[in-house]
Amino acid sequence: MHPKQLIPAEITELTSITNTDVADAPSAVEAVAALADFVGGCPVIAHNATFDRSFIESVKGGVNVSDIWIDSLALSRIALPRLASHKLSFMADLFGCDSVSHRANADVDALCGVWRVLLVALTDLPQGLMARLADMHPDVPWSYRPIFSFLAGQNPGSIFSLSAARADVLKADRADDRVDADELPVLKMPSREEIEADYAPGGLVNRMYPTYEPRDEQIAMALEVRDALVTGTHRVIEAGTGVGKSMAYLVPFAEAARRNNITVGIATKSNNLADQLMYHELPKLAEQLDGGLSFCALKGYDHYPCLRKLERMSRGQVEITTKRDPADTLTAVAVIMAYVCQSADGDLDSLGIRWRSVNRPDFTTASRECARRLCPFFPDKCLVHGARRRAAHADVVVTNHSLLFRNVAAEGRILPPIRHWVIDEAHSIEREARRQWARVVSADESRVLFERLGGSSTGALSQVSRDLATSEGSTLCLGLTAKATSTVARASMAIAGVFDGVRELGRRARGGYDNANLWIGPELRESDDWHDFLQSAYTGIDALEQADKSVDALVQAVAADKPEVVVDLGDISRRLHELAENLKLIIDGTDEHYVYSLQVNRRLRAGGESMTAERIDIGEALATEWLPEVHTAIFASATMTVSKSFEHFNHAVGLDRIGASTSSSLHLDSSYDFDSNMAVVVAGDIPDPRDRESYLTALERVLVDAHLAMGGSVLTLFTNRRDMEDLYARVEPKMARAGLELNCQQRNSSPRRLRDRFINEPTSSLFALKAFWEGFDASGETLRCVIIPKLPFSSPTDPLSCERNLREDRAWARYSLPEAVLEVKQAAGRLIRSSTDSGVLILADPRLVTKGYGKKFLTSLPTSSYQRIESAQIGHYLQLWRARHERRR
């Protein structure tokens, strides 16, 4: 059809369609009308049908093409869930079909070939599964139902058993048990000379990577890790960019696991690093080690499908809770069911499920929710406990910080007993531990909890009533159900009143843009507003306790004879109890281990309110609850020191509370030449940020000059949305006139899409917030300049800062200052990601010059090459810097 505009060059390159080809083509309306005549209301098969359908139906007459659209992309995920990719081009090549050329006829030919493969693959799924899928939730319109019904008719009478399917796929899934390192008097380890040989030319690492060149810093780190394992002590290692820290710890840790038949653990913050370990470094290491190396990734409970819930959903025994598109939930059931019938292990993350319209908790469980012995799939057939079992049989387990700290809170019931850990990206673990150990009372989560409880006609209480209705001798239990329904209804209303009070208290909060975060400190607790709030809070606590007692009484009574009936209700009862306990903790506020706060979303008239209790001293908790259980912990990161000192980090993780002889620290410089490749510019004459208009005007000039001088590829990192959006409105039009693209991290924008756009468009620049301060990698010409307008100190009204200031005289210098220094180091680290990268860091906060603490920021950076320049000269400086470095290439 005629596009009514010129075809972009990249589209012509992709499809070979030129402007000449479409010069006489019909209009969109004419083309869609012709398509409707051709289809004649028949079902339409399309790969990613949602895109095609929305595109066609946006044209006048498009809705007349067909009422039934079958998405072969979603169907391929059901038929072949284990494929590495479900792109049409990938499958066409894999199965020898016609190739995809992004031209209509060729792509249709390819889809026809793939379609036949999909139908055959569906018939290869376990007997009876097609009938199970065709019959589930018949009231929900679902385009795949006729296909499954037809295929089920080819094998009538077959009965599907998920339990049998899991037993069949698990036949070969056997492994040897590992020893708990607590049972070993000492670890058998390679000598220092053997470790050095692994990193020498022709050694183990060289065999993994033929172009590998030995690095003194990497060898020093590997030896330090080896010594820590031998002595059963801890290490804090700051390894600059380019040291190769992952290979430095992998080799000695792998040797420890293999030589002692134990499991060792690696915890990362980012998925990128975990994927690098799982799909690149560990497989290569396993290939080169005699006898191989077993490894697995272990994620949180909510990453794995719960087979009990899946079975009940497929049988129609539970309601579909989503209101958005119930058909997507049925598709999710089909995809997951096919996957678990073919895979001994695995998680939900790669299955392509549309979680925006599918309620994830309908398919997952949690540690406290898991039915365990009441579940027919526990433990061997379960994917959650199967993953834990495989982890206990592996040499190396890769997990994340979140799960590690959840395991600490659960007293070791989630992870296998691992006594030797690498905590990579360790600079962020204090924050993550605080988040995982927080006690939260949330309006949204409370609403979902009461929706799950339901009442006389919906939810778990209604389900129990229906299950008991046909049972003999159920009069007592039905009476308990009625009482529970009544107390739950009262509790739901009472807790709603609590959050109405929270929203009123939120009006007292100063600062914040969209979200108010208010410290529940002495001033608030002594106010009339708080005393007014206490009445509704105590009413809510009392109602929650009454509901908890009545639901628990029902669970206990029914569980005596029919425990399977109240599995879900038992979990909800525990959550109801937890809600009451957390609310009491926060309202009482006397436990000095916590700081208390409340949160309100100002953009919403209702909803989004919460109250939180966070652990203040994470180091104390780690020193008493985790480190005593661990023989060796290696804390590694590129950003740990403040002015060359580890004091702040050691306090944050509790190493300063367990004795000086149990740990030591090591700083390793980067193998990259930061002094030659990185420049730091301090804008010396920017007005004080407290004079906001003067500050923004001066900053606007710096931003415009910097972007024009660099020709794009600039990342500006803001500490607050208000400044960012104000400056974007001022700067973006000037960039557009200069032919430069400037994007901004708007409220609903996707960080991933912004990142991809920045990386793929060389002249693109970005204004961004917290998500981009760390973990954002864009090497080479993609990123040549990072600008930090304001030092990232925590807000004066931040509840944790307020609580620390109340308790300690020098809290700001002890906590807020070093935390800000480390954040700036992280941001600076975005610039140099390889030995050939170069870039400029611009610091536009006048406090670097006017305050004594400014030197701490500058002396903590990886280069000593910094200079103060008047803001009017920054553009000229960048032009000279750019010309000099381009000549060097």
Where are these regions (language model features)?
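Conserved RecA-like P-loop NTPase helicase motor core
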Residues: 671, 683-694, 746-849
